[in-house]
């Protein structure tokens, strides 16, 4: 005090303060297992070793959140992933089942389509066959017409029999109601042959026979009151099934 110097009651006050040294700072960091950041302010500043100052330390520790050890929270956390997996599994199973049903439906529709195509092909074949048969029928009709001949469809039946001709039944008009075959013979002139009236298109049943003794001489006449038709006689007995000869005049 006499020398004008300050006296410290503590012998350690004259030296460097350990609380503000870097060693203490690192010691605190090493002792603290958690990472921390700190700021400090030394007040008041002054010349070295001739003043005292106070260090204020502010530490901010970054600590992780406390994990709860509650059994209910752990179980609920575990159940959520299991529930999600179960839902995903069920969804995938539904998708697979739907895809399988769609594949089955596609196969069924393909089978039905094939059946319809076969039916259409069969119908087309039947139509082609009908067309072919129609053409064949027309060809056969043309050949028949060519063999019979054109109108009036007359041609000789037997060449060695005189006054004998074959006449197509439809050479006469079909609207002739009553046709009478008359001859001059034993039954008298103007008598009806067999007293039978015939339709115009029923020449196959015509039994108009001439006198056998008058073959080539006297020819009976068939008349319907409008026109006159000459019936050719023959000296040979007619048998059933042989053509009856008649000639239109």
Curated annotation (Swiss-Prot):
Instruction: Specify where the region named Basic motif lies, as residue ranges.
Output: 78-98
Entry keywords, A to Z:
DNA-binding, Nucleus, Transcription, Transcription regulation
Listed InterPro entries: bZIP, bZIP_sf, C/EBP
Q: Which intervals of the chain are annotated as region Disordered?
A: 66-90
The UniProt GO MF terms for this protein read: DNA binding; DNA-binding transcription factor activity
One Pfam annotation reads bZIP_2
- Major subcellular site: nucleus
Give Gene Ontology CC terms. nucleus
Q: What happens when the gene is disrupted?
A: No visible phenotype under normal growth conditions. Mutant seedlings grown under normal conditions accumulate reduced levels of zinc in roots. Mutant seedlings grown in zinc-depleted medium have reduced root length.
Q: Which CDD domains match?
A: bZIP (cd14686)
Q: Which domain of life is it from?
A: Eukaryota
Protein's cellular compartments: Nucleus
Give the protein name, as stated in the record: Basic leucine zipper 23
Name the source organism. Arabidopsis thaliana
Q: Which gene encodes it?
A: BZIP23
């Amino acid at each position: 005090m006499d020398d004008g110097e300050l006296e410290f009651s503590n012998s350690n006050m004259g030296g460097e303060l350990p609380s503000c040294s870097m060693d203490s700072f690192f010691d605190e960091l090493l002792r603290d297992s958690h990472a921390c950041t700190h700021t400090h302010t030394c007040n008041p500043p002054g010349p070295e070793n001739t003043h005292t100052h106070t260090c204020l330390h502010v530490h901010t520790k970054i600590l992780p959140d406390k994990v709860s050890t509650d059994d209910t929270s752990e179980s609920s956390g575990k159940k959520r992933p299991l529930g999600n997996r179960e839902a995903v599994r069920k969804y995938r199973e539904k998708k697979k089942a739907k895809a399988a049903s769609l594949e089955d439906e596609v196969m069924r529709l393909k089978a039905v389509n094939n059946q319809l195509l076969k039916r259409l092909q069969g119908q087309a074949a039947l139509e082609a066959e009908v067309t072919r048969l129609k053409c064949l029928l027309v060809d056969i009709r043309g050949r028949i017409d060519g063999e019979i001949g054109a109108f009036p469809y007359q041609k000789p039946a037997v060449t060695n029999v005189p006054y004998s001709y074959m006449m197509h039944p439809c050479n006469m008009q079909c609207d002739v109601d009553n046709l009478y075959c008359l001859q001059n013979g034993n039954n008298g002139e103007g008598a009806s042959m067999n007293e039978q009236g015939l339709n115009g298109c029923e020449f196959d049943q015509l039994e108009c026979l001439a006198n056998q003794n008058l073959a080539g001489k006297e020819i009976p006449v068939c008349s319907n009151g409008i026109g006159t038709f000459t019936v050719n006689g023959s000296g040979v007995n007619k048998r059933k099934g042989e053509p009856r000869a008649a000639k239109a005049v």
